[in-house]
Amino acid sequence: MTEVLWISWGIRLFKSLTLEPAIVLHTRSYKETSLIVESFTRNYGRVSFVAKGAKRPKSKIGVIKTPSCLFLISCRGKGDLKTLTHCEINTYFDPSSENFNSLVYLNELLIKLLEKEDPHPEIFDHYLKVCNFLKHLGKKDLGTHLRFFELNLLKEIGYGLDLKFEANSNNEIKEQNRYAFDPIIGFQLLKDSSDKKNCYKGKDIINFSKGDLTNPDALLASKQIMREAIDFHLGNKSIKIREY
């Protein structure tokens, strides 16, 4: 249950959230005993709130500090920064130590690419799907899931990639050709690829479009393509976890 305030130009401000599915993207200390939490909720997008007293040993909302979980949260407040009134753990993701940085990476993407209080339930559900694999998948298989999460994320926020057609053309991408990638217009046919560092085989692009990254070359190409696209849309922001 959610109380909502409406203002004249159609922007929705949340007065309260009740038992809303949420993941914690980031926390930072606030005063001596509290936390400011950046969360991603299923139905209301990124929501920031204060968890008052969460650092106290016997705090009822101290569970919000538990990493790698799906929570149910309740909070109130009219402004951008709500106040947490209740939280409980719904699911532990329990990522392996090898895959923990992948979870941090996903959280950074959501913080830096999503607007506040802009709902994206499909992204939320896809995030949970990837998190369910963090405990047992190896690096290669997890990489496949990360690439499709990135692809879906860009699509949902309006920056989808065309993996089927050449840029500014109705010509389909062909296996035997090579292409340069431009994050704005897409894949451009290369007549001579000898002077291009970042050129991609048509075969690898087609496999990516079909959801088939079993070939190591296609998996590597998909990683490079998505990094180029994401870095472009991040602008002057950066993904800190890549530095480690």
Model-derived features with residue positions:
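Non-catalytic alpha-helical scaffolds and adjoining flexible linkers that form interface surfaces
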Residues: 3-35, 40-244
